[in-house]
Amino acid sequence: SEWIAQSARWIEERHSPDLSLVYLPHLDYNLQRLGPDDPRIAEDCRAIDRVAGELLKYYARRGVRTVVLSEYGITCVRRSIALNRIFRAKGWIAVKDELGRELLDCGASKVFAVADHQIAHIYVNAPALLNEVRATVEGMEGVTRVLDADAQRAEGLRHERSGDLVAFSAEDAWFTYYYWDDDRKAPDFARCVDIHRKYGYDPVELFVDPAIALPKLKIAAKLLKKALGFRMLMDMIPLDPSLVKGSHGTCPADSAEWPVLIGTGSSDDPIDAVYVHERLLAACAG
């Protein structure tokens, strides 16, 4: 976050753009790793408050209008939901065996889910199953809402790539993308930081597998192997979703855990997230 803030100042001094979008991600990591109730989060808050405060003061000295926007508030979680494993048990998921590893075959699957924290997009390739899939997901422990296309439109969520169904978890739950039943058959990328090959967001990437003895030494050995030209997998990630302590996506009951928008008006009234865009455009025009 400090490097990003310094880069933002560098760009402002050299180019003075009409619009700068600056993302300071520091809080995101430990809030998911430790959970918002962990006392260690206070130090993270102080650290990012200093970085953000210095950047805001810098822009103020240059006469730049600033808007502070948080994407989401993170809530404590204690359980995970593996939709694709349930779908597999129903016979709806197709997997390919590659050298003893299982890959999800989305095209051949009747149903599959793409996980995104506390939201899951469910794609139903067999339309005749839609009602059964919805009933199955609605009956899962930890799922609070399932929206079809019409319900998505009513809430401003319907996108051309949205799932046929969109599921929301309870505040204390989140969705994993896991689809294998045996960790020995998990794909090689499951234990790596590999966001583009996974079937959804994987917050377990924030952890090093606690079962690995001397992890720094193992990482060094892998980097040496790579430097020597050998194929190497940085497979240091655990497959234990219980490690995750914070998530987001479901609207919390406590408004203190909602995201904030500061600097676009004097009203304290909440607004739907779909209207943030026009507020930002108005701030740019004003």
Model-derived regions, located:
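Secreted, luminal/periplasmic, and some membrane-associated catalytic domains
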Residues: E54-L243
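Short acidic-glycine loop/turn motifs at beta-strand connectors
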Residues: A170-E171, T264-S266
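Conserved residues at the C-terminal ends of beta-strands
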Residues: Y23, A149, T264
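Short, hydrophobic beta-strand segments
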Residues: D164, L261-T264
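A long, amphipathic alpha-helix that forms part
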Residues: S1-V68, V274-A283
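Soluble, non-transmembrane catalytic domains of enzymes that act on hydrophobic metabolites at membranes
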Residues: Y179, S266-Y275
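Short glycine-rich loop/turn motifs
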Residues: D18-L19, I119, E257-V260
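Short glycine/proline-rich, acidic loop/turn segments that cap or connect secondary-structure elements
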Residues: L243-L261
